[in-house]
Swiss-Prot record:
Coiled coil location: none
Organism: Paraburkholderia phytofirmans (strain DSM 17436 / LMG 22146 / PsJN)
Taxonomic placement: Bacteria, Pseudomonadati, Pseudomonadota, Betaproteobacteria, Burkholderiales
Protein name (Swiss-Prot/TrEMBL): Polyribonucleotide nucleotidyltransferase
Binding annotation for Mg(2+): D493, D499
The family this protein is said to belong to: Belongs to the polyribonucleotide nucleotidyltransferase family.
GO annotations of cellular component type: cytosol
Alphabetical list of PROSITE patterns matching this protein: KH_TYPE_1 (PS50084), S1 (PS50126)
Thylakoid listed as a keyword: no
Amino acid sequence: MTMFNKIVKEFQWGQHKVRLETGEIARQASGAVIVDVEDTVVLATVVGAKTAKPGQDFFPLTVDYLEKTYAAGKIPGGFFRREGRPSEGETLISRLIDRPLRPLFPEGFYNEVQVVIHVLSLNPEIPADIPALIGASAALAVSGLPFNGPVGAARVAYINNEYVLNPTRPQMKESALDLIVAGTERAVLMVESEAQQLSEEVMLGGVVFGHEQMQIAIDAIHDLVREGGKPEWDWQPAAKNEPLIARVTELAQADLLAAYQLRDKQARSAKLKEVYAATSKKLEEDAAAGGTVAADKATVGNVLFDIEAKIVRTQILNGEPRIDGRDTRTVRPIEIRTGVLPRTHGSALFTRGETQAMVVATLGTKGDEQNIDALEGEYRERFMLHYNMPPFATGETGRVGSPKRREIGHGRLAKRALAACLPSADEFGYSIRVVSEITESNGSSSMASVCGGCLALMDAGVPMKAHVAGIAMGLILEGNKFAVLTDILGDEDHLGDMDFKVAGTEQGVTALQMDIKIQGITKEIMQVALAQAKEGRMHILSKMTSAVSGANTVLSDYAPRMITIKINPEKIRDVIGKGGSVIRALTEETGTTIDISDDGVVTIASTSSEGMAEAKKRIENITLEVEVGQVYEGTVLKLLDFGAIVNILPGKDGLLHISEIANERIKDINDYLKDGQQVKVKVIQTDEKGRVRLSAKALLNEGANGASGAPQGEPTPQ
């Protein structure tokens, strides 16, 4: 008899067999599920605190996705030989899992919940992100926590005009789309994607296809819960304090309405702070007069937020102007300036309303590419995009330092949007880094980074295939009434039911990200939203094209220039030299950066054209092949009794035998040659070991016959 109550569910999912199991591993967690997809195995665990901390006014959910190197049969690098802080990839997948789970916890549930997913085994062809998301959903479902799931997820590719479910990594190389969709049985909750300029119809079709195909995973989780689920928690939301709600509404509603008539963000924020403070103070006075305890500020703040949301949502659904006075379809005023920083390779200042990004592009060589030591294998990243948003961007003080999860996520979204329109490495051999510094923020800063990033790249001379613009959209839904908002503000993001970001060109979409906070948003609503987003994107693209028609044809004076030459791959070791001595001397003496690929392509980069020319000349000399019948100007290196060693090319010596020096018999070689003497010689033979035989006599004879190219200054008796 076993000590485990192990429950296993298996199902065929597209081209993969999936196995879910619970009851054997991590039994002390609130919920734990193993997911196995063709040897990619993840362990997802959930622990929920039984009570909320006193005064807690938000839901403390943390999701950590962790890759273990043993999963791929590797030992970690570094001094300690163990895993360190999460990589960028792990952070992005943690966010990917968090986003569809968070809205499914009930309002008012403030108990701490921690979701931890470990990758235990990795099939390099099967990415672990979808199994991890399925596992996290299943672990929450079996835990009994108050969770309105389960959630399913799927990856969708678009290959040869057909959707493909959960493609392998090799298949993804052929795909024009990489789309991840997560949702419940009834609704889509999250979309994350990048595409090769696809139409809105194809993108929406991928979302619908993924939602349909994930249902089998949701059904399997239901089966797992029926047999292995723990009892549901007896949790009930706190009863609404109707007297408090009525009193706060009485005290604050008129002032909140007045605050939302202020179009300027700073003035509006200041007014809202005044209303919050005045309301709390008045409630404290009421409590003191009545001999009771006043409601805590968190509770009062939640009531005020609900009133704010109702005001803004009602105004918009009734067709009244938005917070800043716009209608639902208008994009905020746009200002564009390029070349703003004198010593950078490319720069742009993109301002849209109260959101502003200063974006800088830097060009580098192959040696500047980022080495990624991923679980599935090492690779190099030629294009990097980093997003930073310091606290001053919103007029606040706060922590400054390493990027937070949000900054990493926004940077990746902007990178995905631009990647489809970058030239290939063959077309433009530079590595590229784009940094977006958000200097003002009031909504849609990641999309400002896309617009500014495209402009900075063009300013740097990167031949982009097309202009790329991005726009953030919002949606408010009440019953049968809904409104789609173009170019949302920060406040509209918080108060709406869906926010989604669309980036692309005139031809199509390159990136799409959706986060849906409620159930009930239909395909038809998403269709309307995408069509309105396209309208906004086209408006921004027209502004960008007017400001910058195309990429600069001349690089910055401070950007490196590059030339490439092809050498025999067998000569690579000669250019590198023993311990790197030759290439090190080359780079130091010519002031260049030299990269050599395995196929013999040598890339020379420098801000000095003279240095590049010198480096090229030296490399060509080093790699010249000795050809039989060719005449060389050589230098005598060493005299021997039977001949001389003559250097004819850098690193290439040959034997000039005593019988090949002159037509007459030579008794003493010193009568004809001396160390360091310049001598013209002809290559008469090479062998498989690379040994070279030379002749000066052959040139004397050619000269005697009147042949062209007769040697000059041939060796003569001393």
